[in-house]
Curated annotation (Swiss-Prot):
This is 3'-5' ssDNA/RNA exonuclease TatD. A divalent metal cation binds at E92, H128, H153. One of its GO terms (cellular component) is cytoplasm. It comes from Pectobacterium atrosepticum (strain SCRI 1043 / ATCC BAA-672). Its cofactor is Mg(2+). It is an enzyme of class 3 (hydrolase). 3'-5' exonuclease that prefers single-stranded DNA and RNA. May play a role in the H(2)O(2)-induced DNA damage repair. InterPro entries: DNase_TatD-rel_CS, Exonuc_TatD, Metal_Hydrolase, TatD-like, TatD-type_Hydrolase. SUPFAM superfamilies: Metallo-dependent hydrolases. Signal peptide: none annotated. Monomer.
Amino acid sequence: MFDIGVNLTSSQFEKDREQVVIRAKLAGVSGILITGTNAQESHQAMLLAQAYPDYCWSTAGVHPHDASQWNDAIAEQLHQMANAACVVSIGECGLDFNRNFSTPEEQEQAFSAQLAIAAELSMPVFLHCRDAHPRFISLLTPWLSQLPAAVVHCFTGNRHELDECLAAGLMIGITGWVCDERRGLELRALLPHIPADRLLVETDAPYLLPRDLRPKPASRRNEPCYLPHIIRQIAEWRGEDATWLGQTTDENARRVFRLA
């Protein structure tokens, strides 16, 4: 099983990153993709991935929250980081009109620029979309023929949005959000509609600790070692064998990010 979304650069992991990786391995997690969310974090993610060769890889990009920082110098930094063998995707990039820490115009500029970089380098993109689906799809679609793959990280949309993402050929990342009996029921109902070869799984650690995890960790911090729990729940709701689903989503991740 492969965790395609871990924020291992988070300060919440500052004191025990080594132990977090060890616990993930002991839990049966076969690989981790470390998320880069701005130039500085992407560089740190790259260094962490290099510290765990053939187990950790990373993305390089600018999250929509940080889109106001976008400039030519950052674009050049992403180009340079993308040359590293452990950097396997451009992102996390996209649109977030829920909180608008950067203006919609700034977000669209940074998103389009990163899609252009990914197309130029023929790299997959690691995508973020929240409360912005129509604009997200309209900006993304013209680039899809030039991209080897596109992953919607932490998908939490509705049936219409899922259908549009699938029709566009996107991979769908599912987190422990689906384990939330308050907010995750709509997403849970959509799980059977995602083809197995388009499904990816992720913890988004240290965020989105599964609410149905027992016993709950005292820290309330999510970790990649909880990925097996998420997979078991997804498999149950899809009517599939958990071991098979873990293997299938692992193969999907390695195909999409060209790790095989």
